[in-house]
Amino acid sequence: MYSEIFDFLPPERIKINEPMKEHSSFKIGGPVDLMVLPESIEEIQRITHYCRKKDIPCFVFGLGSNILVRDKGIRGVAIKVGNNLKNISICNDTIFAEAGVRLAELSQAAADYSLSGLEFAEGIPGSLGGAVVMNAGAYGGEMKDVLKEVRAITPDGNLSSFKPEEMKLRYRGSIFQEEELIVVSALMQLHKERAEDIRARMQDFAKRRREKQPLEYPSAGSTFRRPAGFFVGPMIEEMGLKGFKVGGAEVSRKHAGFIINSGNATANEVLELIAIVKAKAKEHYGIELETEVKVVGEE
């Protein structure tokens, strides 16, 4: 079934029945049938083409910082971009980076060249590709503010460029979520500023994260999208759910907007806890909470 993949990728970049919990910041998830670690855009194109030709399910992810993999795992092929595709180049006030670059590394690189605009990304886990797909943001900044061009592989296997007006960037969403597009690189427009001012903002954001977020536990970041007119953390706290647990899944005592893995949690436990929080929000506030975490895998 996967013979052609074994023909063009070396065995050290192919993993059979790989536990997804080893590739997720939640530290949760069953095995994927086959995980591949491409080192170039061409390899991604070849793998996805093969999967389409053979009608094999294909899941592409970066560093697994915003996913919850179900306990039965993932059928088909998982393409992990976050291990490789890490090139960065800087020209004047623009940065080109491939999808596998860590956001923290990208924001540090910008600061090294006295370029402002990516300070908000300091401390956000995950890769550039995932950040583009969900228009990641924090502390008043988001990817939408800096993206100048994005390259992505289309469903027919071609490489296409997208300008900002074509990306449909919005709060935690983009065209790359809506359509079968695989982000492989981005060009970002920044602006010159004093390096010490940039680093001061980054240090402030990092300090605030350490103080307010449960970074000491595995999680997938903020569990829920922010509904209009509300802040999720205080809302969940007011409902009396701070510290509420289902097995090893827990509403964080430090920040109720985070569901954490407090010890050997299963995906089913996390999903049950999410359902409880959503039901309470509907009952107390008449709000349909939406998850920010992407749930993947076999039910």
Curated annotation (Swiss-Prot):
Question: Gene3D superfamilies this protein is in?
Answer: 3.30.465.10, UDP-N-acetylenolpyruvoylglucosamine reductase, C-terminal domain, Uridine Diphospho-n-acetylenolpyruvylglucosamine Reductase, domain 2
Origin species: Syntrophomonas wolfei subsp. wolfei (strain DSM 2245B / Goettingen)
Known PANTHER family for this protein?
UDP-N-ACETYLENOLPYRUVOYLGLUCOSAMINE REDUCTASE (PTHR21071:SF4)
Could you read off the lineage of the organism from its UniProt record?
A: Bacteria, Bacillati, Bacillota, Clostridia, Eubacteriales
Q: Name one GO biological process term.
A: regulation of cell shape
Task: Enumerate the subcellular locations listed in this protein's record, separating them with semicolons.
Answer: Cytoplasm
Major subcellular site: cytoplasm
Return the Pfam families for the record. Answer: FAD_binding_4, MurB_C
Q: What top-tier enzyme class does this entry carry? A: oxidoreductase
Reactions it catalyzes: UDP-N-acetyl-alpha-D-muramate + NADP(+) = UDP-N-acetyl-3-O-(1-carboxyvinyl)-alpha-D-glucosamine + NADPH + H(+)
* Residues at the active site: 172, 222 (proton donor), 292
A single MF term (Gene Ontology): FAD binding
Q: Does the keyword Cell wall biogenesis/degradation apply?
A: yes
Which cofactors does the annotated protein need, by name?
Answer: FAD
What highest taxon heads this organism's lineage? Bacteria
Alphabetical UniProt keywords: Cell cycle, Cell division, Cell shape, Cell wall biogenesis/degradation, Cytoplasm, FAD, Flavoprotein, NADP, Oxidoreductase, Peptidoglycan synthesis
Sum up the protein's function in the record's words: Cell wall formation.
**Family annotation (NCBIfam families):** murB, PRK13905.1
Identify the EC number(s): 1.3.1.98
Q: Using the record, list the residue span of the signal peptide; answer none if the entry has no such feature.
A: none
The family annotation for this protein states: Belongs to the MurB family.
The pathway entry for this protein reads as:
Cell wall biogenesis; peptidoglycan biosynthesis
- Domain annotation FAD-binding PCMH-type: ranges: 28-193
**GO CC terms on record?**
cytosol
What is the protein name for this chain?
UDP-N-acetylenolpyruvoylglucosamine reductase
